[in-house]
Protein backbone atom coordinates (compact mmCIF):
# COMPACT_ATOMS: atom_id res chain seq x y z
CA UNK A 1 0.00 0.00 0.00
CA UNK A 2 1.42 3.34 -1.03
CA UNK A 3 2.17 6.05 1.48
CA UNK A 4 -0.43 8.36 -0.16
CA UNK A 5 -3.23 5.85 0.39
CA UNK A 6 -2.19 5.31 4.00
CA UNK A 7 -2.18 9.09 4.53
CA UNK A 8 -5.67 9.41 3.00
CA UNK A 9 -6.97 6.63 5.26
CA UNK A 10 -5.57 8.37 8.32
CA UNK A 11 -7.24 11.66 7.31
CA UNK A 12 -10.50 9.81 6.64
CA UNK A 13 -10.42 8.19 10.11
CA UNK A 14 -9.68 11.56 11.75
CA UNK A 15 -12.46 13.25 9.75
CA UNK A 16 -14.93 10.50 10.68
CA UNK A 17 -14.01 10.85 14.38
CA UNK A 18 -14.44 14.64 14.32
CA UNK A 19 -17.77 14.50 12.46
CA UNK A 20 -19.07 11.79 14.77
CA UNK A 21 -18.02 13.86 17.80
CA UNK A 22 -19.79 16.94 16.43
CA UNK A 23 -22.98 14.99 15.73
CA UNK A 24 -22.92 13.52 19.22
CA UNK A 25 -22.32 16.91 20.80
CA UNK A 26 -24.96 18.72 18.75
CA UNK A 27 -27.45 15.94 19.32
CA UNK A 28 -26.88 16.11 23.06
CA UNK A 29 -27.25 19.91 23.12
CA UNK A 30 -30.45 19.76 21.11
CA UNK A 31 -31.91 17.15 23.44
CA UNK A 32 -30.96 19.17 26.51
CA UNK A 33 -32.64 22.23 25.00
CA UNK A 34 -35.79 20.21 24.39
CA UNK A 35 -35.80 19.11 28.03
CA UNK A 36 -35.26 22.69 29.20
CA UNK A 37 -38.06 23.98 27.01
CA UNK A 38 -40.70 21.62 28.33
CA UNK A 39 -43.06 22.31 31.17
CA UNK A 40 -43.83 19.76 33.86
CA UNK A 41 -46.68 18.53 31.64
CA UNK A 42 -44.36 17.83 28.73
CA UNK A 43 -45.69 20.46 26.32
CA UNK A 44 -43.15 22.82 24.73
CA UNK A 45 -42.78 26.26 26.25
CA UNK A 46 -43.17 29.01 23.67
CA UNK A 47 -41.28 32.23 24.22
CA UNK A 48 -43.78 34.95 25.16
CA UNK A 49 -42.61 37.82 22.97
CA UNK A 50 -45.82 39.76 23.61
CA UNK A 51 -45.39 39.51 27.42
CA UNK A 52 -49.03 38.46 27.61
CA UNK A 53 -48.22 36.07 30.46
CA UNK A 54 -46.85 38.96 32.51
CA UNK A 55 -49.85 41.09 31.60
CA UNK A 56 -52.27 38.30 32.47
CA UNK A 57 -50.47 37.73 35.78
CA UNK A 58 -50.72 41.43 36.62
CA UNK A 59 -54.37 41.40 35.58
CA UNK A 60 -55.04 38.47 37.93
CA UNK A 61 -53.16 40.24 40.73
CA UNK A 62 -55.19 43.40 40.12
CA UNK A 63 -58.46 41.46 40.12
CA UNK A 64 -57.52 39.71 43.36
CA UNK A 65 -56.48 43.03 44.90
CA UNK A 66 -59.72 44.67 43.78
CA UNK A 67 -61.80 41.83 45.24
CA UNK A 68 -59.93 42.20 48.52
CA UNK A 69 -60.50 45.98 48.46
CA UNK A 70 -64.25 45.50 47.99
CA UNK A 71 -64.40 43.01 50.88
CA UNK A 72 -62.36 45.22 53.19
CA UNK A 73 -64.04 48.53 52.37
CA UNK A 74 -67.64 47.52 51.68
CA UNK A 75 -68.72 48.53 55.20
CA UNK A 76 -67.47 52.08 54.70
CA UNK A 77 -68.87 52.65 51.20
CA UNK A 78 -72.43 53.48 50.21
CA UNK A 79 -73.75 50.19 48.84
CA UNK A 80 -74.81 51.40 45.39
CA UNK A 81 -71.47 53.11 44.78
CA UNK A 82 -68.98 50.38 45.75
CA UNK A 83 -67.35 49.83 42.34
CA UNK A 84 -67.06 53.54 41.54
CA UNK A 85 -65.59 54.35 44.96
CA UNK A 86 -63.05 51.48 44.80
CA UNK A 87 -61.99 52.85 41.39
CA UNK A 88 -61.59 56.24 43.04
CA UNK A 89 -59.51 54.79 45.88
CA UNK A 90 -57.19 53.12 43.35
CA UNK A 91 -56.90 56.42 41.49
CA UNK A 92 -55.96 58.28 44.68
CA UNK A 93 -53.35 55.65 45.59
CA UNK A 94 -51.55 56.45 42.34
CA UNK A 95 -51.12 60.05 43.51
CA UNK A 96 -51.06 59.67 47.29
CA UNK A 97 -49.32 56.43 48.27
CA UNK A 98 -49.98 56.92 51.97
CA UNK A 99 -53.75 57.34 51.59
CA UNK A 100 -55.57 55.06 54.04
CA UNK A 101 -59.35 54.83 53.41
CA UNK A 102 -60.19 53.65 56.94
CA UNK A 103 -58.00 56.24 58.63
CA UNK A 104 -59.45 58.96 56.41
CA UNK A 105 -63.00 58.06 57.48
CA UNK A 106 -62.06 58.27 61.15
CA UNK A 107 -60.26 61.58 60.67
CA UNK A 108 -63.22 62.95 58.71
CA UNK A 109 -65.57 62.14 61.59
CA UNK A 110 -63.24 64.04 63.91
CA UNK A 111 -63.16 66.93 61.44
CA UNK A 112 -66.99 66.93 61.36
CA UNK A 113 -67.08 67.34 65.14
CA UNK A 114 -64.39 70.04 65.11
CA UNK A 115 -66.20 72.04 62.42
CA UNK A 116 -69.58 71.88 64.17
CA UNK A 117 -68.05 72.83 67.53
CA UNK A 118 -66.05 75.68 65.99
CA UNK A 119 -69.17 76.90 64.20
CA UNK A 120 -71.17 76.82 67.44
CA UNK A 121 -68.42 78.80 69.23
CA UNK A 122 -68.09 81.13 66.23
CA UNK A 123 -64.39 80.34 66.08
CA UNK A 124 -63.62 81.89 62.69
CA UNK A 125 -59.90 81.10 62.91
CA UNK A 126 -60.44 77.37 63.35
CA UNK A 127 -63.14 77.29 60.68
CA UNK A 128 -60.75 78.94 58.22
CA UNK A 129 -58.25 76.14 58.88
CA UNK A 130 -60.82 73.41 58.21
CA UNK A 131 -62.99 74.84 55.44
CA UNK A 132 -62.03 75.84 51.89
CA UNK A 133 -62.00 79.64 51.84
CA UNK A 134 -64.19 79.60 48.70
CA UNK A 135 -66.89 77.73 50.62
CA UNK A 136 -66.57 79.41 54.01
CA UNK A 137 -69.10 82.15 53.31
CA UNK A 138 -71.66 79.61 52.10
CA UNK A 139 -71.11 77.46 55.18
CA UNK A 140 -71.65 80.43 57.49
CA UNK A 141 -75.20 80.70 56.14
CA UNK A 142 -76.15 77.23 57.43
CA UNK A 143 -74.30 77.35 60.76
CA UNK A 144 -77.45 78.24 62.78
CA UNK A 145 -79.19 75.06 61.59
CA UNK A 146 -76.78 72.76 63.48
CA UNK A 147 -76.48 73.98 67.03
CA UNK A 148 -73.83 72.30 69.19
CA UNK A 149 -72.28 68.89 68.61
CA UNK A 150 -74.01 66.31 70.77
CA UNK A 151 -73.01 62.64 70.32
CA UNK A 152 -69.97 61.35 68.41
CA UNK A 153 -70.95 57.69 68.92
CA UNK A 154 -74.13 58.28 66.91
CA UNK A 155 -72.25 59.57 63.86
CA UNK A 156 -71.49 57.21 60.97
CA UNK A 157 -69.64 57.97 57.76
CA UNK A 158 -69.39 56.22 54.40
CA UNK A 159 -67.77 57.03 51.07
CA UNK A 160 -70.34 58.02 48.47
CA UNK A 161 -68.06 59.38 45.74
CA UNK A 162 -64.38 59.91 44.94
CA UNK A 163 -63.14 61.74 41.88
CA UNK A 164 -60.35 63.96 40.58
CA UNK A 165 -60.58 67.20 38.65
CA UNK A 166 -57.19 68.24 37.39
CA UNK A 167 -54.82 67.88 40.34
CA UNK A 168 -57.58 68.25 42.91
CA UNK A 169 -58.98 65.23 44.74
CA UNK A 170 -62.59 65.28 45.91
CA UNK A 171 -63.93 62.82 48.47
CA UNK A 172 -67.63 62.89 49.27
CA UNK A 173 -68.73 61.25 52.53
CA UNK A 174 -72.26 60.49 53.65
CA UNK A 175 -72.64 61.44 57.32
CA UNK A 176 -75.62 59.93 59.10
CA UNK A 177 -76.91 59.68 62.65
CA UNK A 178 -79.69 60.53 65.05
CA UNK A 179 -79.22 63.42 67.48
CA UNK A 180 -75.63 63.98 66.42
CA UNK A 181 -76.19 67.75 66.68
CA UNK A 182 -78.68 69.74 68.73
CA UNK A 183 -80.95 71.00 65.97
CA UNK A 184 -81.06 68.10 63.51
CA UNK A 185 -82.79 64.96 64.76
CA UNK A 186 -81.94 62.75 61.80
CA UNK A 187 -78.71 63.87 60.15
CA UNK A 188 -78.15 62.87 56.51
CA UNK A 189 -75.60 65.02 54.74
CA UNK A 190 -72.89 64.54 52.14
CA UNK A 191 -69.73 66.46 52.96
CA UNK A 192 -67.05 66.87 50.30
CA UNK A 193 -63.41 67.16 51.35
CA UNK A 194 -60.73 68.23 48.90
CA UNK A 195 -56.99 68.74 48.56
CA UNK A 196 -54.42 69.31 45.84
CA UNK A 197 -52.48 66.15 44.99
CA UNK A 198 -49.37 68.10 44.00
CA UNK A 199 -48.86 70.05 47.21
CA UNK A 200 -46.70 68.84 50.09
CA UNK A 201 -49.37 69.94 52.56
CA UNK A 202 -51.52 67.05 53.72
CA UNK A 203 -54.50 69.12 54.83
CA UNK A 204 -57.96 68.35 53.52
CA UNK A 205 -60.62 71.07 53.48
CA UNK A 206 -64.40 70.93 53.55
CA UNK A 207 -65.53 72.28 50.17
CA UNK A 208 -69.25 71.49 50.00
CA UNK A 209 -72.26 70.17 51.94
CA UNK A 210 -75.40 68.62 50.47
CA UNK A 211 -78.38 67.59 52.55
CA UNK A 212 -79.96 64.37 51.32
UniProtKB/Swiss-Prot annotation:
A Pfam family assignment: Tim44
SMART domains in the cross-refs: Tim44
Protein name: Uncharacterized protein RP434
Organism: Rickettsia prowazekii (strain Madrid E)
Amino acid sequence: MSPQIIELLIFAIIAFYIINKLITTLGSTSEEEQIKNKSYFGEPVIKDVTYSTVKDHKKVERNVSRTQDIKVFKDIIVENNINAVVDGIEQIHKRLYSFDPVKFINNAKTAFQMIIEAAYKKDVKELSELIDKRYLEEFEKIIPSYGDFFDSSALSAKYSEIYMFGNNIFIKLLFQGKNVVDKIEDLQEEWTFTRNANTKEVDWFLSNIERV
